[in-house]
Amino acid sequence: GAIGGKDSMSGTFNDIHVPPTLVSFAVAPGKASEAVSQELKKEGDVLILFGQPKDEAGMPLLDVFKAHADFLYQEVKAGHIAAMKAVEHGGVAVTAAKMAFGNKLGVTFGENLPLFKYFSNFYGAILVETTPELAEEFAKQPHTKILGTIGGDSMKLCGEEIAVEELLRSYEGTLDPIFPRRAADIQKEAPILPETKAIPQFYVHTNLSRPRVFI
């Protein structure tokens, strides 16, 4: 494993100023066969939230996180989890949208969470895709909620519906004015290269000496 970090105390780009930032990371090796990607895989599957409660000081209860991690690790090894992603800045709704981008599969959310909690930070929480049958078993774990059903090409939440393609364009286009993702369309004809003949290759069929000592 590895633990590291970086402190960025200054930085500017044109008229954009970067505030002092502390970034930390941790990496642990694992088997590729036990890795699960984040993109939603199958229509009809269920999206379930493994929540992360906090104490009075607002700190995550690590015992709950460890229990969830151990449980999910065993379910991944058993092949019961199709997709999984840690809830990040922006909350459950933003994280689910990023999971939808890969295969353009949407989610129809239920009413198991109040609207504001879909956009609240749940650091330490995990979104999981699994079958409807397994979701019922998963929901027996503490601090879990079934959020909705995967399918279609849009995200549906509290009566609002937005196409996944529209969300993806908005997400990818945020930094286009600063770092364009596509080169300008330059109308130029490609040059015609002259034809060249293949150069014959020669091989030596005799064995070469192999000295054992070099002086």
Describe these PLM feature segments.
Residues 1-122, 132-215:
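Intein/HINT protein-splicing elements and their conserved insertion hotspots or analogous self-processing inserts
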Residues 127-131:
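Short hydrophobic/aromatic beta-strand micro-patches
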